Amino acid sequence: MKILIITDCHHLLPEEAEKLADLEYDVCFLLGDISGKYIDMLLMYLDKDKVYGILGNHDEFGVLEARNIPNIHCKLIEINGTSFLGFEGSNRYKRGEFPMFTQKEARKLLMKCPKADILLSHDSPYKLYSDGKDLEHCGLKAISKYIKKYKPIFYIHGHQHINSKKTLKNETNVICVYRASIIDTETKDITFIF
């Protein structure tokens, strides 16, 4: 399966969005931190029937629904025999009406969710990329716990503004995407789009 992931497009040029026009993919997930204006630009080049999303820590509630994009936060969906679960937002590091959670809130929500073949989120597992002192980018303990408990085949996220691929001890393939990439779940190849 080819999965198009788009995330953290805080700035997007029309010529970047145009690169999506001829791509072959089975499903597209928006993993947050993409403003409504940029989602509209992306949708000009995407197959709208294949697009799902979750919110990031800078997104306004309702931005996906206003564009008829299914929000899969804490929802399990199945596509071509593969199950996907989404988890939006990040660790709460500031005030405001944005999708952010305390560690306890995230654990309470995510641990009620069912097992999925592929877990998708905006934020990362706790301390995977930092020492935990940077509250904005320290990650969520609930994600680490979910991965340990359910051992998804893939865990894909954004938020860190890096492209990275790691395999954890439990064989979960952890992929951090910055902007746009296609992930082939059979070959485990990653193609960076922009």
Q: For each of these PLM feature ranges, what is it?
A:
Residues H10-E15, I34-D40, H58-L64, R92-R95, ...:
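Active-site environment of divalent metal-dependent phosphoester hydrolases
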Residues M1-L43, P114-K115:
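N-terminal active-site segment of His-dependent metallophosphoesterases
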Residues K19-D22, L42-Y45, F61-N68, K112-C113, ...:
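Short loop/helix-cap segments at secondary-structure boundaries that form the rim of catalytic
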Residues I5-D8, C28-D33, V51-N57, I72, ...:
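Active-site neighborhood of phospho(di)ester-bond hydrolases with catalytic His/Asp-centered motifs
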Residues D26-C28, L46-Y52, A66-L76, E171-V177, ...:
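Active-site regions of enzymes building and remodeling cell-envelope glycoconjugates
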Residues M41, Y45-L46, A142-K149:
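Catalytic-core regions built around general acid/base machinery
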Residues I6, E15, I77-G81, K145-Y150, ...:
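Binuclear metal-dependent phosphoesterase catalytic core
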Residues I5, C9-P14, Y52-C138, A142:
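Conserved catalytic scaffold of divalent metal-dependent phosphoesterases
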